[in-house]
Amino acid sequence: MRNLQTRIGLSTKKTDYLVAQLRAHFADCWVLGHERLIASMDNHPKDRHVLAAAVKCGAQSIVTYNKRDFAAAATEPWGIEVQGPSTFLRYLYDLDPALVVEKLEEQARDLGRSLPEQLAVLRKAVPAFVDGLCQDLRI
């Protein structure tokens, strides 16, 4: 959550609210008991807790913009692939295009936007995914 405060500039109050919402709506996603694994991780020291949590829960991948701190030599022994967000979203889209488009339309509607407007916003964070999606949808 430190990244939300330092990089995005969220206040402690907003960060605490977000964490509370994440815990309430994604209770099964919290990893516990990974702390003892941190010291044995070989990736960048400031991100060892992330790899330790992925190992503990049996994750197949870590999705991050920060691939440089998760070298293949550190993740491959654990069978963990490191992907950027655009790659991960494209993988989900390839698995079930209709569901991904449905969820994007739902997200846009919830935010009072059209799908093209929402995709324009998402393009800032995941340009390769949005470009590919727009090409597929011909929009």
What does each model-found stretch correspond to?
Residues 1-34, 107-125:
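PIN-domain endoribonuclease scaffold, especially VapC-family toxins
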Residues 26-61, 128-139:
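Active-site neighborhoods of divalent-metal-dependent phosphate/nucleic-acid chemistry enzymes
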Residues 17, 25, 65, 91-93:
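Sequence-level detector for tyrosine residue identity
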Residues 6, 37-41, 69:
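Short histidine/acidic/glycine/proline-rich micro-motifs that form metal-
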Residues 13-14, 46, 56, 67, ...:
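Context-gated lysine
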Residues 48-81:
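Acidic, metal-binding active-site segment of PIN/NYN-like and related structure-specific nucleases
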Residues 10-17, 49, 83, 99:
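Generic recognition of short, well-ordered alpha-helical interface segments
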Residues 68-139:
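Acidic, PIN/NYN-like endoribonuclease modules and their adjacent C-terminal/linker elements
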